[in-house]
Regions:
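N-terminal helix-turn-helix DNA-binding module of bacterial transcription factors
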Residues: 1-18, 153, 159
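Conserved hydrophobic residues forming the short capping helix/wall of the S-adenosyl-L-methionine
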Residues: 43, 158-159, 189, 213
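Flexible loop/turn connectors
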Residues: 184-242
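Glycosyltransferases and closely related glycan-assembly transferases
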Residues: 89-96, 157, 209-218
């Protein structure tokens, strides 16, 4: 007779579930999808299975994740883009391993994987300035995310070092979504005096800006320099590429 072990019985005997939880803010962004794909590839050759949670910015969901982090559902958890005003649940984990991805809030005792947000935005802005741009727009991400705050910080630092005026009307509050990039771009690119360059805090918003520019027959990069932050697949294959 072939024996198929019971997952439930194994959990009871070992105290482990062989499950890793992955919390992402959304399933509708390329950033989240690439994170999911990367984590799934990472666990594919292990004894672990992946359990996916999406917050949808819901307080109810947050309570579910609190249980998960306390070890009721999974053996370890990866949290992507935890919001700065909601990091209390990160401090609720006791013995369960946890990793925070792109978290720049208050200090936590867990490992963090973050992009070089300040330096990346600083270097990108310096590059736009080196092309001769002075009227540069900047589209932020959600401002209760540390990564958004740091990217704005890098932009401001580069502008100030170059002695360039920071026009508050050219700092747009985006949401890391394509549509938010489109909405801001429609307003900016309809002005009599337009920005000559736009830096977006992620590639998805930059793609939204590019869509609007194409509809208005504004050539990128000949008439508008455009920069994103992420290097997602669509941004690489789009013509022109970001």
């Amino acid at each position: 007779m072939k024996y198929l072990p019971s997952h439930t019985a194994k959990c009871l005997s070992t105290g482990k579930r062989n499950l890793i939880g992955l919390i992402v803010p959304s399933l509708s962004t390329y950033f989240s999808l690439e994170i999911i794909r990367g984590v799934a590839e990472g666990v594919s050759d292990t004894q672990y299975e992946l359990v996916l949670y999406t917050t949808g910015l819901s307080e109810y969901n947050e309570q579910i994740y609190l249980r998960a982090i306390n070890g009721d559902l999974v053996d370890g958890i990866i949290v992507v883009l935890p919001r700065d005003h909601k990091e209390n649940y990160l401090h609720s984990a006791h013995e369960i391993p946890i990793i925070a991805v792109d978290y720049s809030g208050i200090e936590i005792q867990y490992p963090r994987i973050t992009a070089t947000n300040v330096m990346g935005a600083y270097e990108g802005t310096k590059y736009l300035i080196s092309l001769g741009h002075k009227r540069i727009g900047f589209i932020t991400g959600l401002m209760d995310l540390g990564c958004s705050q740091e990217r704005l910080q890098g932009f401001i630092q580069a502008m100030e070092e170059a002695g360039l005026e920071i026009d508050e009307s050219l700092i747009g509050n985006g949401y890391f979504t394509r549509i938010s990039g489109e909405i801001i771009a429609k307003e900016w690119l309809s002005r009599t005096i337009k920005p000559t360059a736009i830096f977006c805090s992620n590639d998805e918003m930059a793609l939204g800006v590019m869509d609007v520019a194409e509809n208005l027959n504004i050539k990128v990069p000949a008439e508008l320099s455009l920069m994103g932050f992420d290097d997602i697949n669509e941004a690489r294959i789009r013509k022109p590429s970001l």
